[in-house]
């Protein structure tokens, strides 16, 4: 039995969002095809994720020195630890995001910061940093109104590229994507683009 974290980062549901529609199709098909697996949904817009700020950095320093943390420091550090441990407990991750300003919503970066922890998801060695998530799988589903996979705008895409880079850094050996793009550039193709993405999601769900 595998544990899957279904991590969504969109303020709207599948009736409005193409990425959420594809994500819903994927996870429903996945659950039908893998009924023995556990699926946990994390809505990043409804989840408290402390940003790494003065309290967090000071709290981590105090923990290393065996010092007492303030209430705010303890609350934030404990919450980040809970997020990390939940992440580590899973075998597979499905991240659903829109493209915002060439990247993704800021809640995604906050989540990545929470789980990118030395000694937990990567380590430093004489050969340099080494990822520790060597038995995990990641799927990223992202919608983009324009075309960024190929063409003149390809170099501007920094959302999926960043996620692929950080997951590789953390040692993840399997990273797949479902990209939904062009529905704003060519509105007359919106339904076709959406239907294709849902079909792709359902197909991948059987083997992921």
Curated annotation (Swiss-Prot):
InterPro entries: Flavodoxin_fold, Flavoprotein-like_sf, FMN-dep_NADH:Q_OxRdtase_AzoR1, NADH:quinone_OxRdtase_FMN_depd. It catalyses: 2 a quinone + NADH + H(+) = 2 a 1,4-benzosemiquinone + NAD(+); N,N-dimethyl-1,4-phenylenediamine + anthranilate + 2 NAD(+) = 2-(4-dimethylaminophenyl)diazenylbenzoate + 2 NADH + 2 H(+). GO terms for molecular function: electron transfer activity; FMN binding; oxidoreductase activity, acting on NAD(P)H as acceptor; oxidoreductase activity, acting on NAD(P)H, quinone or similar compound as acceptor. Its cofactor is FMN. It comes from the Bacteria. Binds 1 FMN per subunit. FMN binds at residues 17-19, 99-102, 143-146. Its EC number is 1.6.5.-, 1.7.1.17. Keywords: Flavoprotein, FMN, NAD, Oxidoreductase. SUPFAM superfamilies: Flavoproteins. Belongs to the azoreductase type 1 family. Homodimer. Quinone reductase that provides resistance to thiol-specific stress caused by electrophilic quinones. Also exhibits azoreductase activity. Catalyzes the reductive cleavage of the azo bond in aromatic azo compounds to the corresponding amines. This is FMN-dependent NADH:quinone oxidoreductase. It comes from Staphylococcus aureus (strain MRSA252). The gene is azoR.
